[in-house]
Regions:
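Loop-rich non-cytosolic ectodomains and luminal regions
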Residues: 1-320
């Protein structure tokens, strides 16, 4: 037991987690936390990913129905990183879960917005791949064993996309994943007309698919294009925070301005702008979600934006 051989008061705070996962309390970590929550008070951070729509949930009315969304970069334009510069960087992982073991079709699509969002390249997982990945790459720095070096993909992006699927042994649910690392090709896609999108097609009426991004560099958006949908912030909750018998903790706003030991007052909002952090309200970045079992998380919120602390005796002024 986490509280030891002799039962004693025990509180454990976990300020960590990931937005990837089934979000249904059935994973090994979720089951472990639920069991230990019987013996200790376990507090888990909700997460700080709610600024963007990093989840997408769809219940299909019929078999063969499709939902489409754009994989939109969180930071558009140039992004210098070390010796490289990326353009409209899309980097991270996406996981899509069926509500049960029923399969669905999953595709990452290179979309040509100049041609009415016509598919230029499809990178599909049409049936269970049992974890075997299919990778498309631009070649050059992104050449890798087993990858399909696709010239149209390379015209759009420098980078790669890998897709795979399997039945999750922990949850019993069928799921598909994509790993993405793309930067717009500055010779043939400098205007950004080639974009990445996600397509999912159902196999049964009433089938539900829950899609989660890792909230690093990509979110789900319709880009104001017909036939595409935006994602939702509802579902940005950390997968670890979905366990039973725990206390899931979000953030609320305490102050939006604060004095510093340098004599100046700092704040989140600039003069003339709207108040993004109104005192007493849940912080916009604080993750949340409504789970399939009906629970709304987090359960409570604690001061998080911003936390005001006393000055400790070891504080010294930086001479620079």
């Amino acid at each position: 037991l986490l509280s030891g051989k002799e039962p004693k008061p025990c509180v454990i705070n976990l300020s960590l987690g990931s937005n990837l996962g089934a979000h249904d309390s059935t994973s090994v970590m979720n089951r472990f936390l639920a069991e230990e929550g019987k013996h200790a008070i376990i507090c888990v951070a909700a997460g700080n990913e709610a600024d963007r729509a990093v989840a997408l949930k769809k219940t299909f009315d019929k078999a063969g129905e499709t939902v489409k969304t754009f994989l939109t970069p969180m930071q558009t334009g140039e992004l210098p990183s070390g010796k490289k510069t990326y353009y409209n960087l899309r980097n991270g992982q996406i996981a899509a879960y069926s509500n049960d073991s029923t399969e669905f079709e999953f595709q990452i699509v290179v979309t040509n917005t100049r041609r009415n969002n016509r598919a230029a390249v499809r990178i599909p997982v049409l049936t269970n791949s049992n974890g075997q990945a299919t990778t498309y790459a631009s070649g050059g720095d992104y050449s890798m064993t087993g990858a399909v070096i696709n010239q149209t993909f390379a015209k759009a992006f420098d980078g790669y996309v890998s897709v795979a699927s399997m039945k999750d042994p922990e949850t019993g649910r069928y799921y598909a994943m994509a790993e993405i690392m793309t930067s717009d090709n500055q010779t043939t896609n400098k205007d950004g007309n080639y974009k990445l999108s996600l397509e999912i097609k159902s196999k049964e009426a009433g089938q539900r698919v829950d899609v989660y991004g890792d909230a690093q560099h990509i979110y789900f958006d319709d880009n104001k294009q017909e036939g595409f949908v935006s994602g939702t912030r509802n579902g940005s909750i950390s997968d670890m925070a979905c366990a039973a018998n725990i206390i899931t903790v979000g953030s609320y706003n305490v102050r939006n301005h604060w004095p510093s030991i340098d004599g100046f007052v700092y704040g989140y909002n600039k003069k003339g702008q709207e108040d993004d952090f109104p005192a007493g309200e849940a912080s916009r970045f604080s993750s949340f979600g409504t789970l399939a079992d009906g629970r709304n998380l987090p359960l409570v919120c604690a001061p998080g934006a911003s936390v005001i602390s006393s000055v400790n005796t070891y504080a010294v002024e930086n001479p620079d």
